[in-house]
Amino acid sequence: MRPFIQNWLLPPKICNGIESGKDLTYLYLKNDISLIKKNQTLKDRYCGKRCFIIGSAPSIKDIDILKLKKEHVFVMSTFYYHHQFNELSPEFHSNVKISDASTESEKLDWLSAIDKNVNSPYFFFDIKDKWIIDKYELFRNKNLYYIAASIIKRKFDISKITRFYRTNPLQALEIAIYMGFNPIYLHGIDLNEACINEYKHFFNSKLLPAKDPDIDQNDRSKRIQSTLFNAASLTYKEFEDIAIYANNKNIDIVNLNPKSMLQMFQIKNFTEIL
């Protein structure tokens, strides 16, 4: 059934069910889902210890990340561009699925750059990107864990199929919760792009291994404003769901970034918790 006919004839819940079924079928047919059972070894491994999830937004320049050198730190994607990255030597490196819109060459460039620049003890990748990692023999002798994500309800159990991630910090948060970290501190996750219509990092975006076709040379979106706000709303809802889950489980998630839009978490200053 073509999408526009499907959406016109069927209620939203049934449409979502159809899309979820299609995505799960593809996930099982194209990937060895048994690989995610390895993640069971991570369950509550760091129970009661604190961690920091550090994003690549411009606000991360406001703090001295070397103050976290003796902490458990998650970074994501291209954080290796930070001038203090090697000295910080973060323990965890999280990567969501590379966009289907990317070519194989772009995916290879992205992953190769991470392989070259990052030597973290733990790497997390979407299982749908395993084929290219295997094909080009990337991350040899490195400790990889795969996440299986689809269009389903979030499980907060990375040894099972869980909900897909709209942004990298969502994956890092679910991993940290699964590993038993408490409290979990956030910084450098601004998520204010829809408000200011600028997609900036702490580094020059021209350094990115692959360019987002929806972002122009001035780091502004080519999409219409209503589309940006709709996407942002869906992303905020995902963070709100995590906040509710964490509150019910007595897990403290603290946002240390006053410039961030993540107001669903308690706010503190970075200097307060050192």
Regions found by a protein language model. Name each.
Residues 1-274:
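Metal-ion/cofactor- or nucleotide/acyl-coenzyme-handling active-site neighborhoods
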